[in-house]
């Protein structure tokens, strides 16, 4: 899974003022990497209106609606490390993983991310990481 995380799509020490701003940043990174079209960002916001993508342990995993599958060019991930946290429907989120999955691949990605974040130690390591490589290593170890 770490192969879907390029160093260019891992953003350290991000400051955002709102959940909406965090979704926009994650979505823009997916657009910039060529994984999705611009329309996918709105689909990420639309999904959030229907159901929160907060997963617990300081993690949110915004992704597009099922109808937005046509806006996915190839699978991709982006990660925002937000050490100060951002309010996410009353919860504090310190890591946002934006997800775009092609051909149903997002379900596998969601599962692997949830497993990684089920360990509090992994969450702490990601929030405190000083480099993209450190973050990728946490996922590689969890995926082993």
UniProtKB/Swiss-Prot annotation:
One GO MF term: kinase activity
PROSITE patterns: PTS_EIIA_TYPE_2, PTS_EIIA_TYPE_2_HIS
Keyword Cytoplasm: yes
Occurrences of domain PTS EIIA type-2 (ranges): 3-142
Any single biological process term in GO: phosphoenolpyruvate-dependent sugar phosphotransferase system
Keywords carried by this UniProt record: Cytoplasm, Kinase, Phosphoprotein, Phosphotransferase system, Sugar transport, Transferase, Transport
Organism domain of life: Bacteria
Residue(s) carrying Phosphohistidine: 63
Catalytic residues of the enzyme: 63
Subcellular locations according to the entry: Cytoplasm
Pfam families per the UniProt record, alphabetical: PTS_EIIA_2
Gene Ontology cellular-component terms listed: cytoplasm; plasma membrane
Keyword Zinc: no
Job of this protein: The phosphoenolpyruvate-dependent sugar phosphotransferase system (sugar PTS), a major carbohydrate active transport system, catalyzes the phosphorylation of incoming sugar substrates concomitantly with their translocation across the cell membrane. The enzyme II CmtAB PTS system is involved in D-mannitol transport.
Free-text comment on this protein's domains from its UniProt entry: The PTS EIIA type-2 domain is phosphorylated by phospho-HPr on a histidyl residue. Then, it transfers the phosphoryl group to the PTS EIIB type-2 domain.
Complex and partners: Homodimer or homotrimer. Seems to be a monomer when not phosphorylated.
Name of protein: Mannitol-specific phosphotransferase enzyme IIA component
Organism this protein belongs to: Staphylococcus aureus (strain Mu50 / ATCC 700699)
